[in-house]
């Protein structure tokens, strides 16, 4: 159990059970982001994944399921996976449906051991930066090797090291590499592609300027070769 996981799980338990965005720190100055911002995330995910009614979606590090739910409603269902039993309990209480459910498991371990279950699209939003390089690479390569129907993965809300100067002084390179820091590891598109391995083409996108994190984050879309 890492310090980052302990902080993630402990923080979630300090928030009211219905404070879905506060539990997963999808906030600005401590306040939950506006619904319009969430809608932007959902629409971008649908577009980047080319999500269709017949798709089955895997949400890795899904948190409490609040972001998964509107995506599952756009497809044929699937599964959300998170390491926090508390957040998965919130997801099961508020967001489970007849065609999708939530599982307590480490994201990389799930990719390496779970049945493919017809998964065609996958999402890891705002969480890849908290995985160490080895775990991230194992997860992405296992998804390619073990999930033959999986065509696209969205790695969303990645902190861009080219923008780190907005937050950190020069010489803070060590902290930028640390997945246990408050923002996690800052990785360039080239570094993300290296983690993904040769089985994926990687395309990077930025959100519109009025998105709350557009000034320092980007999305990476992995497309099976």
Which stretches of residues belong to each language-model region?
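Class I (Rossmann-like) S-adenosyl-L-methionine-dependent methyltransferase catalytic domain
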Residues: 1-53, 64-114, 131, 138, ...
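Short acidic/histidine-rich motifs immediately flanking catalytic phosphotransfer sites
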Residues: 118
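A conserved beta-strand element that flanks and buttresses the S-adenosyl-L-methionine
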Residues: 123
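Short catalytic micro-motifs in class I SAM-dependent methyltransferases
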Residues: 126-127
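A short glycine-rich, Lys/Arg-flanked "PGG" loop and its adjoining helix->strand segment in the class I
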Residues: 137-149
């Amino acid at each position: 159990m890492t310090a980052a996981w302990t902080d993630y799980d402990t923080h979630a338990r300090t928030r009211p059970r219905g404070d879905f965005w506060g539990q997963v720190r999808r906030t600005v100055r401590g306040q939950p982001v506006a619904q319009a911002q969430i809608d932007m995330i959902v629409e971008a995910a649908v577009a980047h994944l080319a999500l269709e009614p017949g798709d089955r979606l895997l949400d890795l590090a899904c948190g409490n399921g609040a972001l998964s739910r509107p995506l599952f409603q756009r497809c044929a269902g699937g599964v959300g996976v998170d390491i926090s039993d508390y957040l998965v309990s919130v997801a099961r209480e508020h967001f489970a449906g007849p065609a999708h459910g939530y599982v307590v498991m480490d994201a990389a371990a799930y990719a390496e051991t779970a049945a493919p279950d017809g998964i065609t699209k996958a999402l890891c939003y705002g969480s890849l930066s908290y995985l160490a390089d080895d775990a991230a690479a194992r997860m992405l390569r296992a998804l390619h090797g073990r999930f033959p129907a999986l065509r696209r993965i969205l790695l969303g809300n990645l902190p861009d090291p080219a923008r780190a100067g907005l937050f950190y002084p020069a010489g803070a390179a060590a902290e930028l590499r640390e997945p246990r820091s408050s923002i996690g590891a800052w990785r360039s598109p080239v570094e993300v592609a290296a983690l993904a391995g040769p089985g994926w083409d990687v395309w990077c996108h930025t959100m519109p300027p009025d998105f709350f994190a557009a000034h320092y984050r980007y999305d990476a879309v992995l497309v099976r070769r």
